[in-house]
């Protein structure tokens, strides 16, 4: 039985009418302080170590629950790399089952992307050297273990990955990590009475929990200086989409999406964030008034009582994050830049048109289930294609090794925050994409395109893509 559009909207929170310990601010009232993952930055050729291991974490402030993590903590450190560098990365699998890892948004050849061909058995390392040759972007690294991606990400194998370049260094945007520039990783879970995550693969559709977490805790707050605050938003949920807004109706100023800056800041009162999508926003805190980001209405009393006896997909609390300004307004504050990037001239013609239909009641893409040994799509590096992606059941669509522009959504203009290059897009009907093939892949190291609902991808809504190197 497939998840109906109405049920999905109710479950997703879209129906608005209805290596070190993380940094923390001082506790305030019943809200926990926002945990800020430690920063792991590439410097002078030194390798970056990411150890996948069992850990313990307190989601609700009580006893710690057994989880998976990276470098000893739930989720992982925020990795920062710089365009032009060659970064040596050492993944170490200290878990009891095979795992593969990838960095969504990092544009690398298929040999360096991870996935099935780079499966790490227990006790095994993988040490790729990654040439960073792309524009600044907020990416994320996570498990993409074949047929086990959903439980592995749910268990805690995920973290934020930031690419900086000369443009990002010189723009007048907040860039002090953990001070005015924060990673915000949103997930939903189902916790038992002891705060231990529960996970059962749903019979159809994706997994929805009843507890929304940000950086591993519920409804946190963070103290910020008066002025502009930069939030790097990542939806690391298995299937839930969020519609974010401010409790006082102030605006989000969107400056970047999945693969980098927008040409200019876009101002919105509501902000969508599908699974796997990233958005960078600026929030004006200069007036000194506290504000919360919310994801719709929380469960009512009857819904909460019902949730005591059966699993619920309605969020108990929809407060994402509370921003609490402190201190005095600086004597000089930067204005929001009018432009972020120079106008880009896109060269080349569309060489091919494709239609991709994501499975609904049955998983698969264009009626075919993912097969590790089959190439489903062949393209040429350095070319453009026009893809129409269709889904009857709302979900995101993600593709490795490419960047795309959203041209239309169900025949209409896309959301303003979807300007700029992306690798993940929300599909509810038909979405038209202009796809550029940045990197090559190979028969034994193909790129994967898939549903962004992790359970659907695990059940076969994925395909392998061979991108032949440019001459």
Curated annotation (Swiss-Prot):
InterPro entries: Cu-oxidase-like_N, Cu-oxidase_C, Cu-oxidase_fam, Cupredoxin, FtsP, TAT_signal, TAT_signal_bac_arc. It comes from Rahnella sp. (strain Y9602). Pfam families: Cu-oxidase_2, Cu-oxidase_3, TAT_signal. GO terms for biological process: FtsZ-dependent cytokinesis. Residues 229-288 form the Plastocyanin-like domain. This is Cell division protein FtsP. It is found in: Periplasm. Its main location: periplasm. Cell division protein that is required for growth during stress conditions. May be involved in protecting or stabilizing the divisomal assembly under conditions of stress. NCBIfam families: PRK10883.1, TAT_signal_seq. It comes from the Bacteria. Belongs to the FtsP family. Residues 1-27 form the signal peptide. Keywords: Cell cycle, Cell division, Periplasm, Signal. GO terms for cellular component: cell division site; outer membrane-bounded periplasmic space. CDD domains: CuRO_2_CueO_FtsP. GO terms for molecular function: copper ion binding; oxidoreductase activity.
């Amino acid at each position: 039985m497939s998840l109906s559009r109405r049920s999905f909207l109710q479950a997703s929170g879209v129906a608005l009418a209805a290596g070190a310990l993380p940094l923390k601010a001082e506790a305030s009232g019943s809200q926990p302080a926002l945990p800020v993952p430690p920063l792991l930055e590439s410097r002078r050729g030194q390798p970056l170590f990411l150890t996948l291991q069992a850990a313990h974490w307190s989601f609700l402030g009580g006893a710690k629950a057994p989880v998976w993590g990276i470098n000893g903590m739930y989720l992982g450190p925020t990795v920062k790399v710089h365009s032009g560098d060659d970064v040596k990365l050492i993944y170490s699998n200290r878990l009891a089952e095979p795992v593969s890892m990838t960095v969504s948004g990092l544009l690398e050849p298929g040999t360096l992307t991870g996935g099935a061909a780079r499966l790490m058995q227990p006790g095994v390392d993988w040490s790729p050297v990654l040439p960073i040759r792309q524009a600044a972007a907020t990416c994320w690294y996570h498990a993409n273990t074949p047929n086990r991606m959903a439980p592995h990400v749910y268990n805690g194998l995920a973290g934020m990955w930031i690419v900086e370049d000369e443009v990002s260094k010189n723009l007048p945007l907040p860039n002090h990590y953990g001070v005015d520039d924060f990673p915000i990783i949103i997930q939903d879970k189902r916790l038992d009475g002891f705060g231990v995550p529960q996970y059962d693969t749903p019979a159809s559709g994706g997994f929805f929990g009843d507890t929304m977490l940000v950086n591993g805790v519920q409804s946190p707050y963070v103290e910020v200086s008066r002025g502009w605050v930069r939030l790097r938003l990542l939806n690391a949920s298995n299937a839930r989409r969020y519609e974010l807004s401010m409790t006082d109706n102030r605006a989000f100023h969107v400056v970047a999406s999945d693969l980098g800056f927008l040409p200019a800041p876009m101002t919105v009162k509501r902000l969508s964030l599908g699974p796997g999508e990233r958005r960078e926003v600026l929030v004006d805190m200069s007036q000194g008034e506290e504000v919360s980001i919310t994801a719709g209405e929380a469960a009512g009393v009857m819904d909460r009582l019902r949730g005591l006896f059966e699993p619920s997909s309605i969020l108990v609390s929809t407060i994402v994050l509370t921003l609490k300004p402190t201190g005095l307004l600086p004597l000089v504050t930067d204005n929001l830049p009018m432009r972020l990037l120079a106008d880009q001239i896109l060269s080349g013609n569309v060489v091919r048109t494709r239609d991709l239909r994501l499975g609904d009641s049955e998983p698969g893409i264009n009626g075919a289930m993912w097969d590790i040994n089959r190439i489903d799509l062949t393209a040429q590096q350095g070319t453009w294609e026009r893809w129409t992606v269709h889904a009857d059941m709302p979900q995101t669509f993600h593709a490795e090794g490419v960047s795309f522009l959203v041209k239309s959504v169900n025949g209409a203009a896309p959301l303003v925050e979807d300007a700029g290059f992306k690798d993940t897009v929300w599909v509810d009907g038909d979405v038209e994409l202009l796809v550029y093939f940045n990197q090559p892949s190979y028969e034994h190291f193909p790129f994967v395109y898939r549903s962004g609902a992790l359970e659907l991808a695990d059940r076969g809504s994925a395909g392998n893509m061979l991108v032949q190197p440019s001459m």
